[in-house]
Amino acid sequence: MPDFMTNLIEKTIVINALATDVWKALTQPFLMKQWMGEEEMNLHIQTSWTVNSPITISGFHHLPFVNKGTILEFDEEKVLSYSHNSSLSRLADESENYSVIKFNLSPAETQTAVTLTITNFPTEVIYKHLEFYWQSTIVLLKKFVENSKLI
């Protein structure tokens, strides 16, 4: 098994906001679109947030894409996780081709620590892409929650 498959991406950031507000930004599609990508990406997010139900995040970034997966955990204001496979990877729709994205929230008074953990990388390219994307996107989440008048 190549090394990248056993790699783990883990990032923790402290957001100056209540867990309630962070949770809204992570789970309300209208708010998710505000920090997950630029407006021209025209993101569309569909899910019921029920465990074992589908999630799709589609849009346009140089090419049309559809990221799909399944909700794995949904413990309100605590844990959210889902599987992830992008159409851009051109990998078969098989379980071994899905990464797992997980958010753990740890509230402390008026702040919330968010730990993002990503596991299971079917290819090195996917590992590098997710590392690159989430390096900046987790910071965008923080800025959005701390500065948004929408929450």
Segments predicted by a language model, with ranges:
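Hydrophobic ligand-binding cavity/cleft-lining segments
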Residues: 1-42
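Short beta-edge strand/loop motif at the mouth of beta-sheet-based domains
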Residues: 10, 30-66
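Hydrophobic pocket/interface hotspot
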Residues: 22-23, 32, 55, 71, ...
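Residues at helix-coil transition
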Residues: 27-28, 76, 146
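Hydrophobic-ligand binding "helix-grip"
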Residues: 46, 61-108, 119
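A conserved amphipathic terminal alpha-helix motif
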Residues: 119-151
